């Protein structure tokens, strides 16, 4: 088959128009290749993805790398297929870019199989309808805002409250307890953070259980708008071909939308609300619908969500919320108390915190814990003004238990062992429920609150109390 070659007719930033001979237009989503001397000395080093057909013989494409150095009339090769990325176990421990090339200087990936990045969501008949909780081993999450297997979790939090550490602990727990793999998509985030994550994962020994796909802030919008899809294809392979329960991390889902909005105007689309692309909900839906449980395995995704100007009604975060099953909110106030993970127990929510899914006992204890913490929050103003002595005996008891619960919600992480000096703890769900039940029932009213800080199970708290008493 002869090669289909076109030529560049127009370059507008990240958007390139390419002219082909009549009747030889490449289909939408096809990958085209062109040589850009400004990137490096390799031939056909720039990938363009067909986004629109213009008239008889022109296509409008989005570039996946820098377009500086391109000129009109340059030859463009149609590869005849969409952007494909290597999949399978060879991708574990590697860093890939949007087009599946390794960027960790550790040689080629040599995978046996490739997947296209645009794939159909699983058919209804293949999807699993069973709703079950996904145990993470992190007490605060499992008790108060449990994750659903094959669900989507939004991770909210400002800078420096522990999003990355929480993500790394989840990767660690999935690898060690469930033997599963994780895929991390760095979408439009800081390159330094991407490097830090790689280094920390290497040090904590979880790197060989995860594949990393990066399209960071310095990349053109084309790469940032597609890198989440590349990572998702790698995760889909582990789910569909190996029957794994995969964890997919997307940091940050807002940047996916932001990149789409950057190229949307260049593609000639009329902007919609707040200047976002008119296809915002469709693009988000195409990505999110592929993240699901099937009869073979599941992809559970944790997505960090940046909220522009803290406005939750902004179209970008608002569209993402529509797809979420659970939210984990990290709070600076809790981090300031030294309680890590700094998850806000009253602000975090889950769709499966429901007695029909998690059982009556778990549900009742979670609600009791929330009640005690809420009551303590309501009493804090009185305590600040009048002091503890002005409270009734009943309220004093509530405050004492709430402070114990607050500390018992903290937990030493495996990935933070190097910094904290205490060994990490994975807490089974039954132990979590038992521990909080005993605190709420008043079985440990005699134990000092510091005994509950940074321990795993309630037995450890009792042991710690004995040591403190000596």
From Swiss-Prot:
Q: Which InterPro entries does this chain map to?
A: AAA+_ATPase, ATP-synt_VA_C, ATP_synth_F1_bsu, ATPase_a/bsu_AS, ATPase_alpha/beta_chains, ATPase_F1/V1/A1_a/bsu_N, ATPase_F1/V1/A1_a/bsu_N_sf, ATPase_F1/V1/A1_a/bsu_nucl-bd
How the protein sits in the membrane?
Answer: Peripheral membrane protein
Keyword field: ATP synthesis, ATP-binding, Cell inner membrane, Cell membrane, CF(1), Hydrogen ion transport, Ion transport, Membrane, Nucleotide-binding, Translocase, Transport
Localization of this protein: Cell inner membrane
Gene3D superfamilies from the xrefs? 2.40.10.170, Bovine Mitochondrial F1-atpase, Atp Synthase Beta Chain, Chain D, domain 3, P-loop containing nucleotide triphosphate hydrolases
Enzyme Commission number, as recorded:
7.1.2.2
**SMART domains, per the entry:** AAA (SM00382)
> GO cellular component annotations, sorted alphabetically?
plasma membrane; proton-transporting ATP synthase complex
Under Gene Ontology molecular function, one entry of this record is:
proton-transporting ATP synthase activity, rotational mechanism
The source's domain of life comes to: Bacteria
Q: What class of enzyme is it?
A: translocase
**For this protein, what reaction is catalysed?**
ATP + H2O + 4 H(+)(in) = ADP + phosphate + 5 H(+)(out)
In which broad location class does this protein mainly occur, judging by the first location in its UniProt entry?
A: membrane
Q: Where does ATP bind?
A: 157-164
What the entry lists under Pfam families is as follows:
ATP-synt_ab (PF00006), ATP-synt_ab_N (PF02874), ATP-synt_VA_C (PF22919)
Q: Which family does it belong to?
A: Belongs to the ATPase alpha/beta chains family.
- How the protein assembles, per its UniProt entry? F-type ATPases have 2 components, CF(1) - the catalytic core - and CF(0) - the membrane proton channel. CF(1) has five subunits: alpha(3), beta(3), gamma(1), delta(1), epsilon(1). CF(0) has three main subunits: a(1), b(2) and c(9-12). The alpha and beta chains form an alternating ring which encloses part of the gamma chain. CF(1) is attached to CF(0) by a central stalk formed by the gamma and epsilon chains, while a peripheral stalk is formed by the delta and b chains.
State the protein's purpose. Produces ATP from ADP in the presence of a proton gradient across the membrane. The catalytic sites are hosted primarily by the beta subunits.
What's the protein here called?
Answer: ATP synthase subunit beta
- What species is given as this protein's source? Geotalea daltonii (strain DSM 22248 / JCM 15807 / FRC-32) (Geobacter daltonii)
């Amino acid at each position: 088959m002869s090669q289909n070659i076109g030529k560049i007719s127009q370059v507008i930033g990240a958007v390139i128009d390419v002219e082909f001979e009549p009747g030889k237009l490449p289909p939408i989503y096809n990958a085209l290749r062109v040589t850009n001397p400004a990137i490096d000395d390799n031939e056909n080093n720039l990938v363009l993805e067909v986004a629109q057909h213009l008239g008889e013989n022109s296509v409008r494409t989005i570039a996946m790398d820098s377009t500086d150095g391109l000129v009109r009339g340059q030859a463009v090769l149609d590869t005849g297929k969409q952007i494909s990325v290597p999949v399978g176990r060879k991708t574990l421990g590697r860093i890939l870019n949007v087009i599946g090339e390794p960027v960790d200087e550790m040689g080629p990936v040599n995978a046996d199989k490739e997947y296209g990045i645009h794939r159909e969501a699983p058919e209804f008949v293949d999807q699993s309808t069973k709703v079950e909780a996904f145990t993470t081993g992190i007490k605060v999450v499992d008790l108060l805002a449990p994750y659903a297997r094959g669900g989507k979790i939004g991770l909210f939090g400002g800078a420096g409250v522990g999003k990355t550490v929480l993500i790394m602990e989840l990767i660690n727990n999935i690898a060690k307890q469930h033997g599963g793999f994780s895929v991390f998509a760095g979408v439009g985030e800081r390159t330094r953070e991407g490097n830090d994550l790689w280094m920390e994962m290497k040090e904590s020994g979880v790197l060989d259980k995860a594949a990393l796909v990066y399209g960071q802030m310095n990349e053109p919008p084309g790469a940032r708008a597609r890198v989440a899809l590349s990572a998702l294809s790698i995760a889909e392979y582990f789910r569909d071909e190996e029957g794994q329960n995969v964890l997919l991390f997307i940091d940050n889902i807002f940047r996916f939308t932001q990149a789409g909005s950057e190229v949307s105007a260049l593609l000639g689309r009329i902007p919609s609300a707040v200047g976002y692309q008119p296809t915002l909900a469709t693009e988000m839906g195409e990505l999110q619908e592929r993240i699901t449980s099937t009869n073979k395995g599941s992809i559970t995704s944790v997505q960090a969500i940046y909220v522009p100007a803290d406005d939750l009604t902004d179209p970008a975060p608002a569209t993402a919320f529509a797809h979420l099953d659970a939210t984990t909110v990290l709070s600076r106030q809790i981090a300031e108390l030294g309680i890590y993970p700094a998850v806000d127990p009253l602000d975090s929510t889950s769709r499966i915190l429901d007695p029909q899914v998690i059982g009556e006992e778990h549900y009742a204890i979670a609600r009791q814990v929330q009640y005690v913490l809420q009551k303590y929050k309501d009493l804090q103003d009185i305590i600040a003004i009048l002091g503890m002595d002005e409270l009734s005996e009943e309220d004093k008891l509530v405050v004492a238990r709430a402070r114990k619960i607050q500390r018992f919600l903290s937990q030493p992480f495996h990935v933070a062992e190097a910094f904290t000096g205490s060994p990490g703890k994975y807490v089974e769900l039954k132990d979590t429920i038992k521990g909080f039940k005993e605190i709420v029932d008043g079985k440990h009213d005699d134990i000092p609150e510091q005994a509950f800080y940074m321990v795993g199970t309630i037995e450890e708290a009792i042991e710690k109390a004995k040591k403190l008493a000596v």
